[in-house]
Swiss-Prot record:
CDD domains: F-box_AtFBW1-like. This is Putative F-box protein At1g59675. Disulfide bonds: none annotated. Coiled coil: none annotated. Residues 9-56 form the F-box domain. PANTHER family: BNAA05G37150D PROTEIN-RELATED, F-BOX ASSOCIATED DOMAIN-CONTAINING PROTEIN. InterPro entries: F-box-like_dom_sf, F-box_dom.
Length: 164
C-alpha cells in the first residue's frame, strides 16, 4: 500500500472524540440503538465517563429551576424542568432531596409533587448552565398555617451539582 492510499484511508474516518461528541447530543433512545454498531461504539457509550457527560449535557440543555426550601436545619432541594409551551402554570418535580445537615453533605431522597408558579413569582435569568439566585416575592413561603420556610430559586441548574 502506498503512502498516498494510507493518507486517504485515514482521512475517511471520523475521529473518536468527534464521534463521542455527536453521540452525546443525540436522544438516549438513539444512543441505545447505536450500541450495536460496533464493539468500540458499545464500549464508548456504556463507559461511566460517557454516561456522566451524557446525563450532565442533557440536563444542561433543558431549562430547569432548582428550588431550595429551608426548615430549621433541614434543607429541601427540588428540581423542576421548565416547559415553555406549558399553559397550566405548574412545574412537575423531576428530582428532590433532603439535606439534614448541608455542612456534612448527607443527601437523601425526598418527594414533593407539584409547585405552582402562582404560589410565588420567580424571575429566571436567561443565562444557561449557571446557578444564580433569582428574585422571588418575599424570602419566605407559607406552605401551611404553622410553618414558614425560607425559599431560594435557581434557574438552569445542572442536576449533578446537587448530588455532589
Amino acid at each position: 500500500m502506498s503512502s498516498r492510499d494510507n493518507d486517504t484511508s485515514q482521512s475517511d474516518h471520523v475521529p473518536l472524540d468527534l464521534t463521542i461528541e455527536i453521540l452525546s447530543r443525540l436522544p438516549a433512545k438513539s444512543v441505545g440503538r447505536f450500541r450495536s454498531v460496533s464493539k468500540l461504539w458499545s464500549a464508548n457509550t456504556t463507559s461511566q465517563n460517557f454516561i456522566n457527560s451524557f446525563a450532565t449535557g442533557s440536563l444542561a440543555s433543558r431549562p430547569s429551576v432548582l428550588l431550595t426550601v429551608r426548615k430549621g436545619d433541614i434543607l429541601f432541594v427540588f428540581s423542576y424542568p421548565v416547559d415553555k409551551n406549558s399553559s397550566d402554570g405548574q412545574f412537575t418535580c423531576v428530582g428532590s432531596y433532603q439535606l439534614t445537615n448541608p455542612n456534612f453533605g448527607n443527601l437523601s431522597r425526598y418527594h414533593f409533587l407539584k409547585w405552582t408558579q402562582y404560589r410565588t413569582k420567580s424571575y429566571t435569568s436567561k443565562m444557561r448552565n449557571s446557578i444564580r439566585e433569582v428574585e422571588t416575592v418575599g424570602d419566605e413561603v407559607r406552605l401551611s398555617d404553622k410553618y414558614m420556610y425560607t425559599m431560594n430559586v435557581y434557574p438552569n441548574h445542572i442536576e449533578s451539582l446537587v448530588s455532589l
